[in-house]
């Protein structure tokens, strides 16, 4: 897989595979650059290298869902269904592997069900966004010094009022 190098930012995750760590970091960099499709491709590559990597599943789940630039209400019905299915399925993979993750990784993973409480779409996902922001507030309270937690918590709040900052 060809890769455009965005830099050396890293977040150490629970994985025995250095190459899975590398591809997770690449996915995180693309995620923070709002190229979610490329982020997902990198997280999937990390999973190829370490199928037990809970955080690679977390990355896919997080990146497949809504964001400040593409909130749920801007998806067309087919796109919303596909995104939710991908996010929900990856979340299940992360949850199934969470026991082997670090405490902060487990907290990030265990916040995801508030973001994706079901696989089927509903008319208005705004309550899901609010529930996820509440879940991330608790993760933040327990991990105030963690930069990723700060980022994900801040983005969860931003997603409550997309394009209104």
Give the role of each language-model region.
Residues 1-52, 57-145, 152-165:
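Short coil/linker segments at helix-helix boundaries
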